[in-house]
């Protein structure tokens, strides 16, 4: 059974990492970021659910009989 030739693995891995780095740098450099980011205020709207206006009884668990 022949041995696996690993002599070219190093250059392949290094070139792949370098290519990925360059591609990601090019993708990131095309993004335009705002120079002065501002906080966007959002209004909280209250959604009323039908069960909020009704009184509901909360049942406590059954207690053990007194001994």
Swiss-Prot record:
Gene Ontology MF: a single term: proton transmembrane transporter activity
Chain positions found as N6-acetyllysine: 54, 57
Pfam families in the cross-refs: ATP-synt_8
Primary location class: mitochondrion
Residues carrying N6-succinyllysine: 54
GO biological process terms, semicolon-separated: proton motive force-driven ATP synthesis
Recorded family membership: Belongs to the ATPase protein 8 family.
Role this protein plays: Subunit 8, of the mitochondrial membrane ATP synthase complex (F(1)F(0) ATP synthase or Complex V) that produces ATP from ADP in the presence of a proton gradient across the membrane which is generated by electron transport complexes of the respiratory chain. ATP synthase complex consist of a soluble F(1) head domain - the catalytic core - and a membrane F(1) domain - the membrane proton channel. These two domains are linked by a central stalk rotating inside the F(1) region and a stationary peripheral stalk.
This protein's name: ATP synthase F(0) complex subunit 8
Gene of this entry: MT-ATP8
């Amino acid at each position: 059974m022949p041995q696996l030739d690993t002599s070219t693995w190093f250059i392949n891995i290094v070139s792949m990492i370098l290519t990925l780095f360059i591609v990601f740098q090019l993708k990131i450099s095309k993004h335009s970021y705002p120079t002065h980011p501002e906080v966007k205020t959002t209004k909280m709207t209250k959604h009323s659910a039908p069960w909020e206006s009704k009184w509901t009884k909360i049942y406590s668990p059954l207690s053990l009989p007194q001994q």
